[in-house]
């Protein structure tokens, strides 16, 4: 059999392969154990001897992955080889409607021409030099982030978890800088139930799921988890004077698409101001146009001292950013933090292309309108099912809460050509499509979900 490097992957569905697929009647399920002991099913077609090399590319990729990749992911049995707009294709030409967007990353979908032009042009000029030197795209991107938000300054990194690690360090440095005479300064943190802030040790300590934290203990001490939305408990603990910063997601993504209330965030702001604690908003998933506003915090009338962003910022390339006020920035000195790859000309050029599109009022308005249409259609088509408890969200970050595990519906939809995710305790369907999704694609997504509701029985 040809090696993977010798196989040409198609960029569009093939009628010949489609005909072959229809002729194959009996699926064979192979299984492999993923992380956390989860079993990931691998679907291969009967009649392997009759399947061409091209038609067996996915199977070969899955088999070879198991030999060379550390088993941290329980992957869906799908190999994706190309994409355009909100559509993805496997090597055999099967089409998928992408309502996962790389876990809320591909804001402009796949192959956006302006994004592609920015990346290819910059790659031909200068890709990386490190932060030993100044580069123009980094400064231009920082100016855009500052102009669009509460922030005065920006620190660049490479991911959401890195951004939260930096926010942890900045918070503790702020307390030591502003209380130079104190022998014991505030070093504690508050995080909330259902929170997700990352998987590196500091960010992991702020993440509420015990199954993520337990295998790696001891992790960073000093974190107290409170009920998301509990104003009294948060206010009392902040008043203790031991809290360096409060980390909160205005809308929880991984946690189940739960939105904070305006009263809750305003109370955190007031308590932090009174105690000298910092308020950190994690908008890694809900920020940058996802809610129909440039930043999710705008809906609450509350501004943080620090905000972490990442996922969609560079349209699929790795980036993170920490946005801070001047009072925080002035406490950070040379050498307090850094990153070799952060803010590279290549990635920043990609991010500029994303921001220049997403920040337009007409674009944000379209996200808000499409999100409302999506939710209304979900309520109409799915709301009558006994397993569907609630449809919630803002803009194009949407959750469908069920009274049973969501994985069976997610799997059935995937087999029918729709990619969606789970969230919460596994009972929430998470829908985070590219922000450029069309109404016709929304209708198609809801129709596929509706047709597969029987998988929940």
Curated annotation (Swiss-Prot):
Localisation per UniProt entry: Plastid, Chloroplast; Mitochondrion
Residues with N6-(pyridoxal phosphate)lysine modification: 311
GO molecular function: copper ion binding; N2-acetyl-L-ornithine:2-oxoglutarate 5-aminotransferase activity; pyridoxal phosphate binding
EC class of the enzyme, as a word: transferase
EC number of the protein: 2.6.1.11
Keywords tagged on the record: Acetylation, Amino-acid biosynthesis, Aminotransferase, Arginine biosynthesis, Chloroplast, Mitochondrion, Plant defense, Plastid, Pyridoxal phosphate, Transferase, Transit peptide
GO cellular component: chloroplast; chloroplast stroma; mitochondrion
GO biological process: defense response to bacterium; L-arginine biosynthetic process; primary root development; root development
HAMAP family reported in the protein's UniProt record: ArgD_aminotrans_3
Quaternary organization: Interacts with the P.syringae pv. maculicola effector HopW1-1 (via C-terminus).
Annotated protein name in UniProt: Acetylornithine aminotransferase, chloroplastic/mitochondrial
Source taxonomy: Eukaryota, Viridiplantae, Streptophyta, Embryophyta, Tracheophyta
């Amino acid at each position: 059999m040809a090696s993977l490097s010798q196989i040409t992957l198609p960029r569009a569905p093939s009628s010949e392969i489609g005909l072959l697929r229809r002729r194959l009647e009996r699926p064979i399920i192979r299984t492999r154990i993923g992380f956390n002991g989860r079993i990931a099913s691998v679907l291969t077609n009967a009649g392997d001897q009759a399947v061409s090399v091209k038609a067996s590319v996915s199977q070969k990729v899955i088999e070879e992955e198991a030999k060379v990749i550390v088993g941290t992911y329980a992957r869906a049995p799908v190999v994706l080889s190309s994409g355009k707009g909100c559509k993805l294709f496997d090597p055999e030409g099967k089409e998928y409607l992408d309502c996962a967007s790389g876990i809320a990353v591909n804001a402009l979908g796949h192959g956006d021409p302006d994004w592609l032009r920015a990346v290819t042009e910059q790659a031909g000029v200068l890709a990386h030099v490190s932060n030993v030197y100044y580069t123009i795209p980094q400064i231009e991107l920082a100016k855009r982030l500052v102009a669009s938000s509460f922030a005065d300054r920006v620190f660049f990194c490479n991911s959401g978890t890195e951004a939260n690690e930096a926010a942890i360090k900045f918070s503790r440095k702020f307390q030591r800088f502003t209380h130079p005479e104190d022998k014991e300064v505030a070093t504690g943190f508050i995080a909330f139930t259902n929170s997700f802030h990352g998987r590196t040790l500091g960010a992991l300590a702020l993440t509420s799921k015990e199954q993520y934290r337990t295998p790696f203990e001891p992790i960073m001490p000093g974190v107290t988890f409170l009920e998301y939305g509990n104003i009294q408990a948060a206010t009392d603990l902040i008043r203790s004077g031991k809290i360096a910063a409060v980390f909160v997601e205005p809308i929880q993504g991984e946690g189940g698409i739960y939105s904070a209330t305006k009263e809750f965030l305003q109370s955190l702001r007031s308590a932090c101001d009174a105690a000298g604690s910092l308020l950190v908003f994690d908008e890694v998933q809900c920020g940058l146009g996802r809610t129909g506003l440039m930043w999710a915090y705008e809906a609450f009338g509350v501004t943080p001292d620090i905000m972490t962003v990442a996922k969609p910022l560079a349209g699929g390339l790795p980036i993170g950013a920490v946005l801070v006020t001047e009072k925080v920035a002035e406490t950070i000195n040379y050498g307090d933090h850094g990153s070799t790859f952060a803010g590279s000309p290549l990635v920043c050029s990609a991010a500029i292309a994303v921001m220049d599109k997403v920040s337009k009022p007409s674009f944000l308005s379209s996200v808000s309108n499409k999100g409302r249409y999506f939710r209304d259609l979900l309520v109409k088509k799915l709301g009558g099912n006994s397993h569907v408890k609630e449809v919630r969200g803002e803009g194009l970050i949407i959750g469908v809460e069920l009274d049973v595990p969501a994985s069976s519906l997610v799997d059935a939809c995937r087999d029918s050509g729709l990619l969606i995710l789970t969230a919460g305790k596994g009972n929430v369907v998470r829908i985070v499509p590219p922000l450029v999704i069309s109404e016709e694609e929304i209708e198609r997504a809801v129709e596929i979900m509706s047709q597969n509701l029987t998988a929940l029985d």
